[in-house]
Design a protein with these regions (language model features):
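Long, contiguous domain-sized segments
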Residues: 1-239, 243-252, 257-261, 280-580
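Membrane-penetrating hydrophobic segments
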Residues: 263-272, 310-311
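Non-transmembrane, membrane-adjacent beta-strand/coil modules in membrane-associated proteins
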Residues: 275-278
């Protein structure tokens, strides 16, 4: 049994309607703009309890009965011709919006350490330790509940206007501006004169806001996203017990996979690359970052035990390592990545993402480079999976994995011995050599699911894997412990469903997740592992037969992979063919 982030809520609508007035604010335009003042006016000026906005034509606002405001008075205070206001009962509000109204009202109960800010129709939690030393950047946690009742907590950044070079850019001017009050809470800037010291909900390019899902250290365990999600549920039940009850939902675990199956992939990768000539080229401006490149070259040469060349010696067999900037750098420039030849193994290393990491964790970066080169070599030259023994599954016939990207369908057909071939269809009249792929292609068109992958097993069963908003939550008791442990017993009790690979059953529906590796795990879990849903299209559920294809680390170094590893091959094939 494990806890998930899906909320189970029950509402006392009669009590809610006796205590609160709820209004729906609607625009005659296509949508309410993200920076519209109407998203803050009810909170700032007319004492609304909370306001919820979900990117569309309507926002919802709640008031206490004692601060009664009429529909016409609310309309007058908003002072916008395109807006209309309608008073509604709580039973007319969708559950995910209603629970948000209560969650966002927690902005009225902030403490010294945690500030809850209901601004722009959203809820942001801030903490003194999340503010940069110079005060120009403030990390925050955006709390929301999706339409499927899954609670989410995502890191974001509020940045001082003074940081941005182009302060008059259209993108910046369209964002609402907020002032930081003396008590640490945000409030909407009322006029443009105030905005020189204001913040906007926008990060600095290349700097992603990060707050860990769960910290397993005594002094920081109450700083992760999971802690605040659990705290919100506790606060809701404590403060609003007359109006609702809320809890995280349970899900049954049917099977766990804890052992990895690719213990020798590092050696296999090294063996593959060392059997080829390797050359390092730069796509930088002439002479730029030459010291970084030479350092990279030296590290790679030492790991391989052979010289790294400056150019190809045998073009038909050599492997290329390309040194360049990352994608963000080339946003407004000519990107050399898009011009790389894909008729040979070419692995890119970026200055921003890799060179610094080589100093910090040389082994991990170099092993990642070599395993990526090996996968590309499997695709371009070997036509066989070499980093795992596919034949050990003892399948009798072919397995097929398919995915769609930008209207194009791609398929990987794997034979029982681990050899494979790819096919793709472009356009409505595109043809396949393998006739089975026509049916799979049609199935992909029919299913409206997120991030879907289609699978045909060796018995003719067809399944689809799709991404959900679900993830597992830690046992709330973990936040009360005086001493933390990461041993097997503690992982089972407090981190059920979060660590290792788990197969779930939820009232007949099948899900799985590939969590963090439990054995030897670190003290922090950066991200929550999403649950993937397995939908049977024809025949039986097949995911258990290939659950171990997620227990490999050659897809994402030192981590289990969230999709069967043939999808990694398929994605690399897509990149190669799209570039060509």
């Amino acid at each position: 049994m494990a806890l998930t982030n899906k909320l189970h809520c029950s509402f006392n609508h009669q009590s809610i309607d006796e205590q609160y007035d709820i209004f729906q604010i609607t625009t005659s335009d296509k949508y309410i703009a993200r920076g519209a003042r109407v998203l803050d006016t009810p909170i700032e000026s007319i004492k609304a309890v909370s306001l919820v906005f979900d990117y569309g034509g309507s926002a919802f606002v709640a008031f206490y009965k004692k601060d009664y405001i009429t529909q016409s008075a609310l309309m007058k205070s908003l002072a916008e011709e395109k807006l209309s206001v309608k008073k509604i009962f709580s039973s007319e509000v969708k559950d995910y919006v209603l629970i948000r109204l209560f969650i966002y009202s927690l902005a009225n109960y902030s403490s010294e350490s945690n500030m809850f800010n209901n601004i722009g129709g959203k809820l942001y939690i801030t903490h003194p330790s999340w503010k940069s030393r110079n005060g120009k950047n403030i990390k925050a946690l955006e709390i929301s509940v999706e339409r499927d009742m899954c609670m989410t907590a995502s890191a974001t950044t509020f940045t001082s206007i003074s940081v941005f070079k182009d302060k008059k850019s259209k993108a910046l001017l369209e964002l609402p501006r907020y002032l930081l009050s003396a008590n640490g809470k945000f409030r909407r800037a009322l006029n443009f004169d105030e905005t020189k010291d204001a913040y906007v909900n926008k990060g600095i390019p290349g700097k992603k806001a990060e707050l860990p899902f769960l910290e397993l250290k005594q002094d920081t365990i109450r700083m992760g996203r999971a802690y605040f999600m659990n705290k919100i549920v506790e606060m809701l039940n404590d403060r609003f017990s007359a109006f609702l009850s809320v809890s995280f939902s349970n899900i049954d675990i049917e099977r766990k996979v804890t052992e990895r199956r690719d213990i020798d992939f590092v050696e296999k990768s090294l063996d593959c690359v060392s059997n080829h000539g390797v050359y390092l080229t730069s796509r930088m401006v002439d002479g730029a970052y030459s010291d970084d490149m030479q350092s990279l070259k030296s590290s790679l040469s030492k790991a391989l035990g052979k010289q790294i060349n400056d150019a190809a010696v045998d073009k038909s067999n050599d492997m290329e390592i390309v040194f360049l900037h990352n994608e963000d750098y080339y946003q407004d420039k000519d990107d050399p990545y898009k011009k790389l030849s894909r008729d040979h193994v070419a692995q890119c290393i970026t200055l921003e993402d890799a060179t610094g990491k080589i100093v910090a964790n040389k082994k991990a970066v170099i092993n990642t480079i070599f395993k990526e080169m090996t996968i590309k070599n499997d695709i371009l030259r070997m036509y066989r999976i070499t980093l795992d023994d596919w034949s050990s599954f003892k399948f009798e016939h072919d397995w097929i994995f398919g995915e769609e990207k930008s209207g194009k369908k791609y398929f990987m057909v794997i034979h029982p011995d681990g050899t494979f071939e790819f096919e793709r269809q472009e356009g409505f009249l595109g043809r396949y050599r393998n006739k089975v792929l026509y049916e799979l292609s049609n199935k992909l068109d029919e299913l409206d699911l997120k991030g879907k992958v289609i699978i045909l097993d060796d018995k003719g069963n067809i399944n689809v894997i799709s991404r959900t908003n679900l993830f597992c939550m830690p046992n709330p008791e973990i936040f009360k412990l005086e001493k933390l442990s990461r041993n097997e017993e503690s992982r089972e009790k407090y981190l059920s469903g979060i660590v290792d690979i788990n197969l779930f059953n939820d009232n007949g529906e099948c899900f799985y997740s590939a969590g963090i590796v439990g054995y030897g795990m670190n003290t922090a879990i950066p991200k929550a592992g999403l649950l993937y849903k397995v939908t049977v299209v024809e025949g039986k559920n097949v995911i258990e037969s290939i659950l171990e294809t997620m227990s490999v680390m050659f897809v994402k170094y030192n981590s289990f992979t969230v999709l069967p590893y043939p999808i990694k091959y398929l994605i690399e094939y897509m990149k190669i063919t799209d570039a060509n």
